[in-house]
Swiss-Prot record:
Interacts with A1BG. Residues 207-240 form the ShKT domain. GO terms for cellular component: extracellular region; extracellular space; specific granule. This is Cysteine-rich secretory protein 3. Pfam families: CAP, Crisp. It comes from Equus caballus. It is found in: Secreted. Its main location: secreted. Residues 42-171 form the SCP domain. Residues 1-22 form the signal peptide. Belongs to the CRISP family. The gene is CRISP3. Keywords: Disulfide bond, Secreted, Signal. Expressed in the salivary gland, in the ampulla and the seminal vesicle. Disulfide bonds join 191-198, 194-203, 207-240, 216-234, 225-238.
Amino acid sequence: MALLPVLLFLAAVLLPFFPASGQDPGFAALSITKSEVQKEIVNKHNDLRRTVSPLASNMLKMQWDSKTATNAQNWANKCLLQHSKAEDRAVGTMKCGENLFMSSIPNSWSDAIQNWHDEVHDFKYGVGPKTPNAVVGHYTQVVWYSSYRVGCGIAYCPKQGTLKYYYVCQYCPAGNYVNKINTPYEQGTPCARCPGNCDNGLCTNSCEYEDLVSNCDSLKKIAGCEHELLKENCKTTCQCENKIY
């Protein structure tokens, strides 16, 4: 199961408010329908991913995903200061993670993403949070090695009071798995795990599938990938042998 903590920039009263059209030109400039905004979001994530400390040997390069963005925008439009349901942000059978950010002013997307990443100051690779109450899940999702699709949305929510600019990014496949949360990527020389599939320190050999059951490795040894059960439920294990997943 993915660890889906409530990860919020600031706390506020949770009430169902409807979005409105932001009058601030700064808000309009943040629309994810703009190609330059999509590029900014992707580039910011990739810049942070390729410069993690310690460096990563298996970090996938992120790309914009329109289906993920649609889900993120739909959730942002609800103006709810809480995470969406897992089924509402899934893309097909693929589970997706989510980061939320709220602000009193229309901050740039780069600033919002940097805010999530700044939780790294409370995180130690291989150990986890430095203190029991530290929030680090935004950071670990941003740098989760196998999350390679990103889509975001933003809404203007004036009835939320001070925090009226609502940013949502969703990531597929989801990160923050409990058994790996302290090591969100594999430490090593950049692209060491993806020779021949490297772009400026990030791996490009992503897997488009996700195993639907947890024991695909053992099932493959017992029945082989030609078995109908594995064809349906173990596509990652059977079709992504030389890919990062």
